[in-house]
Curated annotation (Swiss-Prot):
Pfam families: RuBisCO_large, RuBisCO_large_N. The modification N6,N6,N6-trimethyllysine is found at K14. GO terms for molecular function: magnesium ion binding; monooxygenase activity; ribulose-bisphosphate carboxylase activity. PANTHER family: RIBULOSE BISPHOSPHATE CARBOXYLASE, RIBULOSE BISPHOSPHATE CARBOXYLASE LARGE CHAIN. RuBisCO catalyzes two reactions: the carboxylation of D-ribulose 1,5-bisphosphate, the primary event in carbon dioxide fixation, as well as the oxidative fragmentation of the pentose substrate in the photorespiration process. Both reactions occur simultaneously and in competition at the same active site. One of its GO terms (biological process) is photorespiration. This is Ribulose bisphosphate carboxylase large chain. Its cofactor is Mg(2+). The modification N-acetylproline is found at P3. The basic functional RuBisCO is composed of a large chain homodimer in a 'head-to-tail' conformation. In form I RuBisCO this homodimer is arranged in a barrel-like tetramer with the small subunits forming a tetrameric 'cap' on each end of the 'barrel'. Its EC number is 4.1.1.39. Substrate binds at N123, T173, K177, R295, H327, S379. CDD domains: RuBisCO_large_I (cd08212).
Amino acid sequence: MSPQTETKTGVGFKAGVKDYRLTYYTPEYETKETDILAAFRMTPQPGVPPEEAGAAVAAESSTGTWTTVWTDGLTSLDRYKGRCYDIEPVAGEENQYIAYVAHPLDLFEEGSVTNLFTSIVGNVFGFKASRALRLEDLRIPPSYVKTFQGPPHGIQVERDKLNKYGRPLLGCTIKPKLGLSAKNYGRAVYECLRGGLDFTKDDENVNSQPFMRWRDRFLFVAEALFKSQAETGEIKGHYLNATAGTSEEMMKRAACARELGVPIVMHDYLTGGFTANTSLAHHCRDNGLLLHIHRAMHAVIDRQKNHGMHFRVSAKALRLSGGDHIHAGTVVGKLEGERDVTLGFVDLLRDDYIEKDRSRGVYFTQDWVSLPGVLPVASGGIHVWHMPALTEIFGDDSVLQFGGGTLGHPWGNAPGAVANRVASEACVQARNEGRDLAREGNEIIREAAKWSPDLAAACEVWKEIKFEYETMNTL
């Protein structure tokens, strides 16, 4: 006689579906210093109470599933479950709330941004209880921050390596972004650097295409760097994009850059992935390379106000994963960025300790302990007339990157670089003398143009250029 399988109801277990809020909505909970805190902007489906929607987010990003399971009795749910501990309505919005969720630290692998995001945003955004969901901010506790290496070098070490202090660094993305041969590409790099820029940059699209294979580009760019350094007496850099189809190929390209003696490489961290980025950041620290990060694909994730993930979260993740520079919008150029919001995540990139400030979109106080800072890069549709505003907004610890604003100069790349360097130094000097860049900016540029023909020509070309569109990235 064959044995029969008998199903018994265990003590404390009752099969079936129950509301998430019965277990995961805990308004009485007092957060711990070790909790990872998340602020979600959520729009519940009609008929779904906000407490249920918030609890669903907490459950699905921790221990919950759609039905009660008997294996719940084999662990301590009270220790490991996420908790929705507060819900507040969003002012001026109908049926929209900020749900605050606390995640126990033991839910996350040490030093892994990949695991952090897989847990917190990996599954909940398709959940039916919410019509829309956006992760606005994360609080990373110091105990978890200390499990990450972070940026390969950080702001102070970079300045020491470059021997450049007291001003923003200046860069240029080589254009056209695609189609140049390696030799012509290197020529464009040389002209920009000898004109006075600190950096030039591969576009994020440039990897290793038929018109320009990566090794050829690396060799011609290295030649351009060394020649411009010999002529100017300044240390120069070019962001050689090491992003590739496999992590192994990426590391091979970074190793080649190190062998050539160039100071910095680049990675597209969202399309390349956090695991690859963290590996590259470790390699860069071990081998003395700076790491420039491009955020290609970010607007797919963060541009919609009600759904996705705010860039301040991606910026925090990058500081954990590792990068010495990251693109952060301009406020004044062609790419997205409201001033208060942008400065909020710029401070999260650079500063050691940032206080909660909802007026700038900072939902939690963040202590980075000993993690190095990241230089924000302002890039996209900017030119010499923007220099006063950029200097006033971003300050010295930034990279101001002019692509078309250098290469579009009527006299060529080197005069375009001269114009940007003169404009930058004029703004820094005026600021140091106590002048108001926001109010006197145009006058400062005009005064500098009187003794710089290169700047005067640039001012004439771009005097009417504006990008006046309503920003989407608002509080």
